[in-house]
């Protein structure tokens, strides 16, 4: 099954938007546009770029809008117009939203995954990543099958620096402060749907599929 929908997920770190995106990407043949993945790929390919933004990522701060906008826009230009995609982690600021509108990056639906702060901290403290393929796991929600090794390439799994408790708290505050005007904009547009991210990933996916 293929979808040509242009979808945005809004949700705090730990809301499950990345994992849910990957489930839908595989099922509906969508392109997954994750700013986190784009940054990690660019960092691995460009040492000058890595030095430029590493401090932002390790501290849980947002990378300057002009850098993020260019990275996302350059990626979207490569996607065929009739191809559906999921935006995950963008836009995060009003300036990024304005850039989207100005550059004709249109959306069919927006899903806002609402979740309590204590749930976020609990989930992120259990999150692990593969250093080689960047696949993510969660010891609460999506456990690796082989201990603490990646299911795909058997590489040791690690905890990211920005999943430390003190960084998580900062990321939550940053998200809550920046998301309000973005949610309000899409509320007026009539394309936003609110989801309870406290439920299981499977339940959330079933809800989303009603709109696809």
Curated annotation (Swiss-Prot):
This is Adenylate kinase. PANTHER family: NUCLEOTIDE KINASE. Belongs to the adenylate kinase family. Its main location: cytoplasm. ATP binds at residues 14-19, 127, 136-137, 199. HAMAP family: Adenylate_kinase_Adk. Keywords: ATP-binding, Cytoplasm, Kinase, Metal-binding, Nucleotide biosynthesis, Nucleotide-binding, Transferase, Zinc. It comes from Mesomycoplasma hyopneumoniae (strain 232). NCBIfam families: adk (TIGR01351). Catalyzes the reversible transfer of the terminal phosphate group between ATP and AMP. Plays an important role in cellular energy homeostasis and in adenine nucleotide metabolism. It is found in: Cytoplasm. The keyword Kinase applies. GO terms for cellular component: cytoplasm. Its EC number is 2.7.4.3. Residues 126-163 are annotated as: LID.
């Amino acid at each position: 099954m293929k979808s040509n929908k242009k979808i945005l997920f809004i949700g705090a770190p730990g809301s499950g938007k990345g994992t849910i995106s990957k489930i839908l990407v595989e099922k509906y043949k969508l392109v997954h546009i994750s700013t986190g993945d784009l940054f990690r790929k660019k960092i691995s390919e460009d040492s000058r770029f890595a030095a430029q933004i590493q401090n932002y990522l390790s501290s849980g701060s947002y990378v300057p809008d002009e850098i993020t906008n260019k990275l996302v826009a350059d990626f979207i230009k490569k996607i065929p117009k009739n191809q559906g995609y999921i935006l995950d982690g963008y836009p995060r600021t009003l300036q990024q939203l304005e850039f989207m509108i100005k550059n004709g990056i249109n959306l069919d639906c927006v899903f806002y995954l609402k979740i309590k702060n204590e749930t976020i901290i609990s989930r992120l403290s259990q999150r692990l990543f593969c250093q080689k393929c960047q696949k993510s796991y969660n010891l609460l929600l999506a456990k690796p099958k082989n201990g603490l090794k990646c299911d795909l390439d058997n590489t040791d799994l690690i905890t990211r620096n920005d999943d430390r408790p003190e960084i998580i708290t900062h990321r939550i505050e940053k998200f809550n402060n920046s998301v309000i005007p973005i949610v309000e904009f899409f509320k007026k547009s009539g394309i936003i749907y609110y989801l309870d991210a406290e439920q299981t990933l499977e339940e959330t996916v079933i809800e989303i599929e009603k709109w696809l």
